[in-house]
């Protein structure tokens, strides 16, 4: 598993180290994400918004990945918890989160220049959408790539296998960002797959897979930057498995104390 966290070496070797402004932006996105996530959780408990999924534990993955993308050419297809850390693509996302969870139709209506698709509650559907977008970009000769976030549980859905197979066949410029947070609601990873890692599954589709420390935003950024270079260079897809741990609830509708071991 790739990580840049090593007390005996520089955090990120030159020339891959982002400048101070980028590092501060990543940190700000992570703090914003946890703040917004906590606020939305509390609002749900007050009965002021509907069910929502906290991002706690995945902030570094999303902020790190977003920092490696170009918001003017690349497209992001999130699941239901990443928007909190995607402010780099546009602040309208945060307005959309609040409106969506209040049941307002404008919550799923993003500005035309925002390269983030509205999230889907149905598991893994956004993976197929990302591959379709990436393939279309390739056909039209558009610059950039598509990146889709999904969880370990979504990798058990048929949509994932169909999308990954098509992406491999068509060499679509897409990045599969699998967030392995240890749990698919209450199902642990040990009961989710018999594979050595989720990253290893990529080889069956004809493209590489890597595993990265999901608590290390710079390692995630570096992995996504390499995957992006591969995608826009015409070499096809890549799967990046970011390993982290879900801190608390899957969503406001469940009770993790019923299945997660006590800390």
List each model region and its residues:
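Acidic, glycine-rich active-site loops and adjacent beta-strand->loop/helix elements
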Residues: 80-85, 150-156, 178-184, 215-218, ...
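Conserved phosphate-handling catalytic cores of large alpha/beta enzymes
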Residues: 188-199, 203-239, 244, 248
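Cofactor-binding active-site loop characterized by glycine-rich and histidine/acidic residues
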Residues: 35-38, 42-170, 188-194, 199, ...
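Loop/turn elements at helix/coil->beta-strand transitions in domains of secreted/extracellular proteins
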Residues: 172-173, 235
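Short beta-alpha connecting loops at secondary-structure transitions
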Residues: 182-187, 207-212, 257-263
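Cofactor-/ligand-binding subdomain signature composed of acidic, glycine-rich
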Residues: 1-51
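Glycine/aspartate-rich loop-and-adjacent alpha/beta segment that forms the canonical ThDP
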Residues: 2-12, 230-263
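Short, proline-centered helix/strand-breaking motifs
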Residues: 173-175, 208
């Amino acid at each position: 598993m790739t990580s840049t966290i090593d007390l005996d070496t520089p955090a990120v070797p030159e020339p891959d180290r982002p400048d101070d402004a980028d590092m501060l932006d990543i940190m700000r996105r992570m703090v914003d994400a946890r703040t917004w996530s906590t606020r939305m959780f509390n609002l749900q408990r007050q009965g002021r918004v509907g069910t929502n999924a906290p991002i706690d534990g995945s902030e570094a993955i999303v902020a790190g990945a977003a920092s490696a993308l170009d918001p003017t050419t690349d497209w992001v297809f999130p699941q239901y918890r990443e928007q909190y850390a995607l402010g780099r693509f546009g602040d309208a996302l945060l307005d959309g989160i609040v409106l969506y969870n209040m049941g307002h139709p404008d919550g799923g209506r993003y500005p035309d220049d925002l390269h983030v698709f509205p999230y889907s509650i149905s598991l893994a559907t956004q993976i197929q959408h990302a591959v379709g977008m990436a393939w279309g970009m390739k056909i039209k000769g558009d610059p950039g790539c598509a990146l889709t976030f999904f969880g370990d549980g979504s990798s058990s859905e048929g949509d994932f296998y169909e999308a990954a197979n098509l992406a491999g066949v068509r060499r679509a410029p897409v990045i599969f960002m699998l967030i392995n947070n240890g749990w698919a609601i209450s199902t642990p990873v040990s009961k989710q797959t018999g594979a050595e890692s989720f990253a290893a599954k990529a080889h069956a589709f004809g493209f590489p897979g890597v595993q990265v420390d999901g608590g290390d935003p710079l390692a995630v950024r570096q992995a996504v930057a390499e995957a992006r270079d591969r995608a826009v260079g015409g070499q096809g897809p890549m799967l990046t498995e970011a390993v982290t741990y879900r801190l608390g609830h899957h969503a406001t509708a469940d009770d993790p104390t019923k299945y997660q071991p006590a800390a």
